[in-house]
Amino acid sequence: MPRSTTETHTKRKNTPPPPTSPPPTSTGSGRYVIDPVTRIEGHLRIEVEIRNGQVASAWSSGMLFRGVEMILKDRNPEDAWLFTQRLCGVCTYVHGSTSVRCVENALKINVPDNARTVRNLLMGAQFLHDHIVHFYHLHALDWVDITSALKANVSATKTLANSLSPNAPAIDFATAQARLQTFVASGQLGVFAGAYWPHPAYLLSPEENLLLAAHYLEALKLQARSARMHAIFGGKNPHVQSLRVGGVTCRYDINTARINEFRALLQETRRFVETVYVPDAALLAHAYPEWAGLGGTANLMAYGEFPQSVSEPASLYFPQGVILNRGSSAALNIADIQEHVKHSWYDGDVARQPSVGVTAPRYTALNTADRYSWLKAPRYRGEPVEVGPLARVMVAYKKGHPEVKAAVDGFLSKASMTPDQMYSTIGRSAARALETQVIAKAMDGWLNLLQQGGNVFQPWSMSASATGYGLNEAPRGALGHWINIQNGVIGNYQLVVPSTWNFGPRCMADKPGPVESALVGTPVADPQRPVEILRTVHSFDPCIACAVHVIDPRQDRVYVVRAN
C-alpha cells in the first residue's frame, strides 16, 4: 500500500527509501490471454499459463501481416526508403535510414562526412523523442497510480523533488495536481481512463506518484522539442524527407541559424534527461527492487549505431556485439542470423538467412502448439537474443565504453543495484534512460562537426545486379534490411525488425522468444488486471495503445481494461 503522505525522503541525498510494502502474491492458476496489446507495427497477443500465482509459460503472437517485402519487389532500389519509412510513425526515421544504408552497402557507396553527421543527428533526435515518450507516456503508468497523486501533500512533493534532483527545472506541483483533479472531476479521464488503480502492485507513495505524474505532463512538451529537432534537418516529422541514397538533401539547412536552433532544443532536452528522466528511472528502481530480478533474458545483441567514419563497425559510437549467457561481449557475425518459421504463419519450416529470406504467408489457425504468429523467429547461432537499449548499453558497458560505463556505474550506485540486475524489467527501463543521457551529450559534439557549404552527397550509378544489407539501431533495437538487386530493380527485399527479435515465437528447436522467456516467473496478483505482465511487455517498448481484453477461458469471461 502507499506510504505515508508525510514522508519527505530527506534521509539520504538523491536516493529515495526502499518501499515498505512487499510485492503482492497470489495462488491463482489457469490460462489467460491479453489480446490485443497493440503497437505501431501491428497487434500483439500475449497468452500466459499461470501456476500458483506466477507465469509458467508464455506465447507471443504478432497478429498483423506486414507484407512490405512483397510490395517492394520490382521497384527502384532508390525508392525503397520512402516505402519502408512508412512502416512506423513513431520510429519515423529508422527504416528510411536502414534502407538507404542497405542500398549504399550493395552499391559500395561511402557518404560524405557532412551527410553522416546529419544522419547521426537525425537518429539521435529520434532516440531522444522515442525514449522520453516511452518512459513517461507508454510505460510509467504501469508503475504510477494517478489517483493516489490526488492525495499527495504538495509541499512534501517539492521536498522530495529537490532531494532527488536539486538542479531539475522548477515544476508547479499544485498546478499539476489540479490538472489531474480536473480530469477526475470531469468524468472524462482520457488517457487515464480504465486503468488498474487501485492495485496491490502499485507501491509508490502519493508524493512519488504526483512527482512522476507532473513529469508525465512536462514530458509532453519535451517530445515536441525533439520532434522539432528532427524537422530542422529532416524537413518534417514524422517521416523525414531529406534522406537519399548517397547522402542527404539538406545542404542549405546547414547554416548558423539552423544549427543554433537545433542546439537550443538539444540543450533543453538534455537538461530534462539528466535532471528529470534519469532520476525518475532511479526512483522506480528503488521503489520496485523486486523488479530488478524479474523479466530478464540471457542473450543480448546490438548492431551498433552512430558511425563516426567510413570504417564500420570499428567507428560506431555505440559498438556492435553479442552477449550470450550473460557473458562477455563478443564479435557479431551476421552470417549467423537465421529466421525460423516453424511456429509462424508462413510456408515450410526451413530456417533461412535474411539475405535469401522468403515471405510466403500461409495462415492456418492460432495454435500455440503449432503456428501462432505472423512474426518469424530470428535466431543468432540458434539462440534467441534480446535487442534494444539494454543490449546496446550492456554491449558497450562490457566493451569498456567510457561514457556508458560511467553512466551505468553511477546509476547502479544510486539505485543500489548490481550489474547483473540490469538484466531485468527495471534494468531495461534504466538502460533506456542512461542511453538517452549518453546520446544527448554526444550530439552536442556532433553539431560542431557540421560544415556549412560542405558536401552532403556522393554521386553514384545503379548496378544491374548487387546484394547488400543495412544494419541500424532503432530505439527498440537491432534493425536490418537485406536487398537483392536484379536487372536494376529489387528482386528480393527482407526486413528483420526489433519487434521480430523480441516478440517472435518459438523456433525450430522450440526455444521461446525473448519476451516469452522474460515473462516466466512473473508474479501476478490479479490475472484479471495483469499489470505485472504488462510491465515486462511494455519494457521492450511495443508502443502500446488503447484497450486490452483479458479472457479467462475457464469462465469464458472477457475483462475489458486499459493499457495506458
What are these model-derived regions, one by one?
Residues 2-476, 497-564:
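Active-site bordering "gate/hinge" segments
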Residues 214, 480-483:
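Short acidic loop-to-beta-strand element that houses the catalytic metal-binding Asp/Glu
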Residues 471-474, 482-484, 492:
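Compositionally biased, low-complexity/repeat regions
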Residues 488:
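Mixed-charge (Asp/Glu-Lys/Arg
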